[in-house]
């Protein structure tokens, strides 16, 4: 048996007070992991989360359960993760709409979008597009902005301060089209309903949920915000080639966790997730929604650096056009 003097010596050395990571946590993971989707079922975050979860579960040997925590434009679920224990059992599919665009446009946030998280890697990204109905008189972006110089042309977005809102404001200024009018909605779905009902002339939105209607011809894209034309839609020009390079952008999804995630867990996830993203069955699903991994995909410090740069750039845009979410 250990005598009192020996115990005191061990305590002074920190052996008793500070057990190692493996002793404190056991082999991670040893129970189910929750993967938080901060938007409702059916959207981009939910779709990607449910594609990733079973593959991640197989790689880690524990179940990975997608938990939808929507509300306040993604802030509720994201804030829940920020305040969760950093034990590897709560992960987040982070979204640029929260960590970049909300950070750029909101007067206050319940968390620091960088400091309160362990940001591991970008997963996929989706460009934005300008959509019109198939029977729209606007066949080109030039026709669209020319009309908006002399009469009201309405574009819908998923809400005030969203990436589509900011892109529309930039296009209006760059094209000198002052009557390009923003109509905000509580999400993309009601905006699409009004576009199809002819209540608005156009919509700016991530390509993800619009791929099928573009393919079947019910919607026409006038421009895409990707750096190059999309192989799946080679006839859709980029904003850059049409003279609007400042509109080149994308909405990314990433893998994040609460701040202070132990390094061995970070290393394990950094090892298993990138190969998962490259599996043929996932690449096909990502291609189906035109939401693909960047090449190369930034991770760790590079991912955080990308995030900081985007927050700074979009904060400047928001201030230029006085776009503030209270």
For every predicted segment, state its role.
Residues 3, 73, 140, 186-187, ...:
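Short loop/turn segments at beta->alpha junctions
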Residues 6-24:
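N-terminal export signals
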Residues 23-114, 177-202, 295, 323-326:
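N-terminal (or domain-start) structured segment
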Residues 30-32, 263-326:
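An extracytoplasmic/periplasmic, membrane-proximal ligand-sensing/linker region
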Residues 83-89, 104-190, 239, 252-285:
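Hinge/capping helix and adjacent helix->loop/strand transition within the periplasmic-binding protein
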Residues 107-114, 228-246:
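Small-residue (glycine/proline)-centered packing/hinge motifs flanked by hydrophobic/aromatic residues
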Residues 154-236:
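Ligand-binding pocket segment of bilobal, Venus flytrap-like solute-binding proteins
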